[in-house]
Amino acid sequence: MMRKVITVVILLMGIFLSISTMALERTSLAICGDGGGWPPYHFEKERKVIGYDIDVLEAVFSPLGLTITVDLPPWQRCLRETNLGRYDIALSAAYSEERDKDYILTDYYYTLQPSYVYSSITYPEGLPIRTAQDIDGFRVCGLQGYNYTGFGVDDSKVRKNGKTFDQVVKMLEANRCDVFLARYEILAGFKASEGIDHLTNGLKVVSIPGISGDKFYMLISRSIPDGLELKSIFDQHIKQLRVSGELDRMIEKYIE
């Protein structure tokens, strides 16, 4: 019996060491995020990419001796080049069946509240939206390359013409759409991290009725040989950071 226990312990140690050794065999990770900005999760400040995402990456991978580089190209290019293996990981992605097929999804590491934004100048009484499905009856704007399935709406009906929040705000103010979709925490993040307030000139944000927080993941390329090992390392560490409360402390730095 003792011999069996020792054998099991040795096997478990071997698995752990093999994962750690794998991580140490590569010296760096190439990461990409949304060039349009996704504060407080990742954004550029004083020519440096910072934010919650980067803090999480460093907490997970820096102890393994990996150097982390983060670029912020347009989001669609980030996704495309991660798919091709030019980047190892894409940051802050909502779930979709297509992404689950094209990438290796990590465990989720934060949630956001899906909301819609409307103009109280155009609609002083607000909009008659009681369910997420009611939104489909309006002209809805969103950002290019984004997935709005988690908002409870028909993603195919969202006009994804804007490359940045500034552009979708202007589309709303020009009455080219009735609402635009966003996560409240991101809008708050722009104000807290960069001093940019997207909710001026009568714009109001409302949580979408009946929709709970949307989970966000990192997307690991299926074109790299150690993708599953990176996922295993990330998932193990993120669970520990969540249980210890460290994830909450990380985000509190950016949104108070």
What kind of region is each of these model predictions?
Residues V8-S18:
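Bacterial N-terminal signal peptides
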Residues L24-E97, K101-D102, G142, N161, ...:
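Extracytoplasmic small-molecule ligand-binding "clamshell" domains
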Residues G35, T111-S115, D197-D235, E256:
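Periplasmic-binding protein-like
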Residues G36, R47-A59, S119-S156, K170, ...:
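Bilobed "Venus flytrap"/periplasmic-binding protein-like clamshell domains
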Residues I54-P63, Y123-P124, Y217-M250:
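Extended ligand-binding regions for polar small-molecule ligands
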Residues E58, T67-D134, G145-Y148, K204-I211:
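Acidic, polar ligand-binding/catalytic clefts
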Residues T67, G145-K160, H198-N201, I233-E256:
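Ligand-binding clefts/hinges and TM-proximal coupling segments of bilobed small-molecule sensing domains
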Residues Q76-D88, I104, D166-E194:
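Short helices/loops that flank or line small-molecule/ion binding pockets
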